[in-house]
């Protein structure tokens, strides 16, 4: 399934046009709420917004690259910079969504015990660990195994390959024999692990909702709030990481599905602000947490 270059260009441009204002508004809204009362959820939302804004800024260049059928339009030395700006948020976003889901689950399932550890300083530490983990893992994989890396033994610039047509390509002409295991390791640690955490927390939140005293309407809304993070992981970032697994299992699969996965991943900059903004506004799990906390106090 190979999309026409014009369609890929249009999808990247649309994601940028929608994602940039949405993420700016999300960051401004989270900052305004943080000035009144900083919570762990706001810390995760701020870091997710900054990560998505970095991805959004890289989308115009990705659109130009798609219109040129994958040819790299800038100097070769800028390919590593683009790789960090584009691929780092794709993986870091899953970590922030998993952290946000874990905080919501702990607040709903263990309201009394979680209150003792519900401090923003701990959340900042979690976010710093996510930034460091993703950056170090990406740096090791790209620096060692990418075209022009330490293990590649070629004279090209880092990340740059020149296929038979003579046009330089940034990362997308990577040798499948080395690209498959490298990308699979990234997906395994930085996507499937956060996905498993988010899914577990979603199920736990549903169980907490089933035992709560909320009305049916509020239960439905809270269930949607709890599932927002899981939804964006599956719909946006899931296809890209599925293509990484497929290319690892079948090295000769081709890059068509990867191109489609990169486009769906770009649209996470549109869905993520909607998910975090809705989580911040809705009564959902905050109401559950408050109700269960009050119930715990009344039992004493």
Swiss-Prot record:
Effect of residue 172 to A: Constitutive receptor signaling
Effect recorded for residue 183 to A: Reduces response to linolenic acid. Strongly reduces response to synthetic agonists
Topology in the lipid bilayer: Multi-pass membrane protein
Localization per Swiss-Prot or TrEMBL: Cell membrane
GO CC, one annotated term: plasma membrane
Outcome after substituting residue 244 to A: Reduces response to linolenic acid. Reduces response to synthetic agonists
SUPFAM superfamilies per UniProt: Family A G protein-coupled receptor-like
Intrachain S-S bonds: 79-170
Impact reported for residue 114 to F: Reduces response to synthetic agonists
Swiss-Prot/TrEMBL site (Important for receptor activation) positions: 145, 172
Regulation acting on activity, per entry: The receptor is strongly activated by gamma-linolenic acid, while myristate gives a lower response. It is also activated by phytanic acid and pristanic acid. Is also activated by synthetic agonists, such as TAK-875 (fasiglifam); this compound is a partial agonist and potentiates the activity of the endogenous ligand gamma-linolenic acid.
Transmembrane segments: 9-31, 42-64, 80-101, 122-142, 179-200, 224-248, 257-279
Glycosylation sites: 155
Record topology, Cytoplasmic segments: 32-41, 102-121, 201-223, 280-300
GO BP annotations, alphabetical order: G protein-coupled receptor signaling pathway; glucose homeostasis; insulin secretion; ligand-gated ion channel signaling pathway; negative regulation of interleukin-1 beta production; phospholipase C-activating G protein-coupled receptor signaling pathway; positive regulation of calcium ion transport; positive regulation of cytosolic calcium ion concentration
Keywords, comma-separated and alphabetical: Cell membrane, Disulfide bond, G-protein coupled receptor, Glycoprotein, Lipid-binding, Membrane, Receptor, Transducer, Transmembrane, Transmembrane helix
Extracellular side: 1-8, 65-79, 143-178, 249-256
A GO molecular-function annotation: lipid binding
InterPro entries listed in its UniProt record: GPCR_Rhodpsn, GPCR_Rhodpsn_7TM, GPR40-rel_orph, GPR40_recept_FA
Tissue distribution: Detected in brain and pancreas. Detected in pancreatic beta cells.
Record's function text: G-protein coupled receptor for medium and long chain saturated and unsaturated fatty acids that plays an important role in glucose homeostasis. Fatty acid binding increases glucose-stimulated insulin secretion, and may also enhance the secretion of glucagon-like peptide 1 (GLP-1). May also play a role in bone homeostasis; receptor signaling activates pathways that inhibit osteoclast differentiation. Ligand binding leads to a conformation change that triggers signaling via G-proteins that activate phospholipase C, leading to an increase of the intracellular calcium concentration.
Family indicated by similarity: Belongs to the G-protein coupled receptor 1 family.
Protein name: Free fatty acid receptor 1
The organism of origin for this protein: Homo sapiens (Human)
Species classification: Eukaryota, Metazoa, Chordata, Craniata, Vertebrata
């Amino acid at each position: 399934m190979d999309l026409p270059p014009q369609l890929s260009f249009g999808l990247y441009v649309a994601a940028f046009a929608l994602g940039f204002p949405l993420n700016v508004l999300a960051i401004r809204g989270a900052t305004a709420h943080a000035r009144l009362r900083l919570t762990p959820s706001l810390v995760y939302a701020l870091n997710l917004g900054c990560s998505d804004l970095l991805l959004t800024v890289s989308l115009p260049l990705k659109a130009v690259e798609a219109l040129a059928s994958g040819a790299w339009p800038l100097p070769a030395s800028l390919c590593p910079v683009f790789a960090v700006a584009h691929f780092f948020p794709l993986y870091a976003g899953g970590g922030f969504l998993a952290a946000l889901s874990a905080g919501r689950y702990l607040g709903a399932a263990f309201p009394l015990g979680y209150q003792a550890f519900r401090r923003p300083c701990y959340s900042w530490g979690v976010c710093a660990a996510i930034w460091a983990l993703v950056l170090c893992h990406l740096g090791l994989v790209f620096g060692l195994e990418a075209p022009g890396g330490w293990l590649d033994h070629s004279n090209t610039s880092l990340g740059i390959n020149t296929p038979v047509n003579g046009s330089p390509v940034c990362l997308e002409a990577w040798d499948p024999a080395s690209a498959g295991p490298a990308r699979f390791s990234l997906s395994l640690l930085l996507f499937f692990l956060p996905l498993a955490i988010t899914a577990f927390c979603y199920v736990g939140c549903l169980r907490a909702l089933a035992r709560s005293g909320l009305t049916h309407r509020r239960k439905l809304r809270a269930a949607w709030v709890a599932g927002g993070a899981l939804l964006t992981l599956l719909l946006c970032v899931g296809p890209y990481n599925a293509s990484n697994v497929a290319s690892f299992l079948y090295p000769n699969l081709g890059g068509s599905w990867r191109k489609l996965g990169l486009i769906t991943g770009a649209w996470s900059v549109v869905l993520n602000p909607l998910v975090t903004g809705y989580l911040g506004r809705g009564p959902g799990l905050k109401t559950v947490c408050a109700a269960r906390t009050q119930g715990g106090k009344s039992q004493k």
